[in-house]
Amino acid sequence: MPHSDEQGSLGAKELWRPSSREKTQIYDFMSKVGQKYDIPLKDYNALWQWSISEPAKFWEEIWHYTQIKAHRPYKQNLLYPANAPDENDVAIIGATEADREFISWKELRERVRQCANALKEAGLQTNDRVAGFVGNHANTVVAMLATTSIGAYWTGVSPDTGVHAVLERLKQIEPKILFADHASLYNGKVHGSHAKVREIVADLPFLEVLVVFETAKDVDFKFEGVRPANGKVVTYNDFQSAVQNESASLEFASLPPDHPVYILYSSGTTGAPKPIVHGSLGTLLQHKKEHLLHCDLRPGDRLFYFTTTTWMMWHWLVSGLASGATIVLYDGSPFRPFDVEGGNGEMAMPRLIEELQITHFGTSAKYLSVLEQAALNPSKHAHRPVSLSTLKAIFSTGSPLAPSTFEYVYASIHPDIMLGSITGGTDILSLFCSGCPILPVYKGEIQCRSLGMAVTAFDPAGNDISASGEPGDLVCTVPFPAQPVMFWPPGPKGLEKYRKSYFDVFGPNIWHHGDFVRVNPVTGGVVMLGRSDGVLKPSGVRFGSAEIYNVLLKHFADEIEDSLCVGRRREGIDSDETVVLFVKLSLASPLPCQSSRAGFSPSFAKSSVLVMFLASSILVLRSQ
C-alpha cells in the first residue's frame, strides 16, 4: 500500500509499505529457517544478520528452498525448472518495434536441441568459447543455452558496440564460433551490420564459423568479405538444416559446479577490458535467491528488463526461466516513435507492459528520469491510457535513482508496487543490495543489503562506519557463491588480475567494489553516492577512461597531443554523471572539435557518446 506521511532516519521518507508480507516467498523462507534453527527471526534485518553470520547454513537453506537440481547443469535448470510450467505455456516473449513472438517451453527446448546439435557437428567442445554480436532476441537465448549445454562458454556483445570495443574483448578470449545479427531495427530504422561484422571477422584469425541471424526484412547482407580466413559463414537456418543426425536428443554435459558459463568484461579503466568468467552453480544459486526471495518471482509471472546482451542484466533476466517465469525480450528503442500520437515515444514501454501483461519491469534510472522530466502519467495519457494493473514491481539500476524519481514513480506510474532500486555489478553478475517485498520503500534508498551479502561501508582506514550513517566504500566481508571463478586467461596471470581488481585496497579477505555508499542505520536502506574509483558511468553505461584513450591513440594520434577524460557530477545539481573529455590539440595539425567527436562514432558504443568535448592548445594537469 502507498505511504507518504512517515519519515525514517536521516530524512528518509516512506513511500510504500507492503500489505501482504505473509504471502511472499521471503516471509515463507524466513519462517521455515526460524523454525528449523529455533531462532527468532522477526524481521528482514534479523534474517539478513543470520545469513551473513551463518553463511554455510544460509546457503544450504537457499539450496533447498530454490530446489536447484544438483545433477542438472545450469542450462538444464533453466529449461526444466523445479516448478515446471506446462510445456505449452509461454516461456519467452520476443518483442521488437514491429513484431511479437511467443515461444512455449516445448518449442524452446526443441530449438535449443537443434542448435546444440549444429554446434556439436561444427566441432564445438567443452571449454571452447562462443561469442554473440547479437541483439536481445529469442535466438540469442537459444544460442546461449545450446552453447552452455555442451560446456562451452558464452559471451555477448551488443550490435551497437563499436568495432574497436568488440575486438578489445573478443581477441582476448578467441571464440571458435561467432553468432551475428545481420541488421537491427532501432527507432523505426533498419541498421545493417555488414560493415561491422566484416571488420570484426577480419581481425579474429582463430574464428572457424560465422553464423548469421536474419533479424530484419529486406536487408542486403553479402557473404563476401565476412567469411573467416580459416572457416565458413552460414545463415542460422542453413547451420541447423545441415545437421546429419536431426533426431539426436538434447544432452547436457555433466560438469563441475564452478564450470564457466559466461564471460563478461570489466570497464577497461586501466587498459583493455578484463574478461570476467562466471561459474554455473554460483550464478544460478544467486539469481534464484534474488528472483524468488527479493523479487517474489513465481511461475506464470512475466519478467522484463530493458537491456542489451552486453549488460549483466541480460543474464539476470534470462535466469528468470529457472523460476518458471516467462521472460520478455525486447530489441529496439524504449522511445519508439508514435507518429499518430505525437510526443517522443514515452508511452512505448508502458504500453508494452500493458500489452504483454508484464508483472516485473526492469530498466535504468536514466529511463525513469526521462519519464519524470516528461511528466508522463500513463493512466492519464491523452491517447490510449494504460492501467498497468498487472505490474507488481519496478526495478532500477545502472546509476543511482534520484530521490525525486522515487516520488514520481509512486505519484504517476503506480501507487502500489515495489520500487526496487538495485545495485550489483558485472563483477558478481548479481546484486549486493536489492529490493525486498516485506520492507517499506524509502525515498532515495535501496531497500536492503541482499541476503548472504555482508555489505558494509568502510572508511579509508578500513573501519566499518555503516552504523554511523557516514558515507564510505562499499565492501563485502564474507565470501559469496557468485564471485567470478577466474579472470581470463586461466592461470597465474588471470589470478593476479582478479586479486588486484577486488582485494588490493582493504586486504585479501575484503571485497572492495568501488562504489561510494551510505547505510541508513535505522531503516537498513542503502544510498548510492556514485563511484569511488575511476570508472565512468553516464546513464548507467559502465566504462573506463582507458577505452576513450585507446580510441584517441588509434585514430587521432597526430591530431591530439594529450587528453584527460573525467566524470562530473555536481552535488545538488546533476542527477547523472557527465563525461567530459579535455584534449590538447597538436599545434602542427589542429583538428576541429566536431570532426573529433564524429570520429568516435564508428569506434565506440553509441550509448557512450561524450556529452562534453573541450579542445584547447593547453591542458594543465595538477596533482592533488
Residue ranges and their predicted role:
Residues 45-50, 91-145, 162-167, 232-241, ...:
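Conserved AMP-binding/adenylate-forming core of the ANL superfamily
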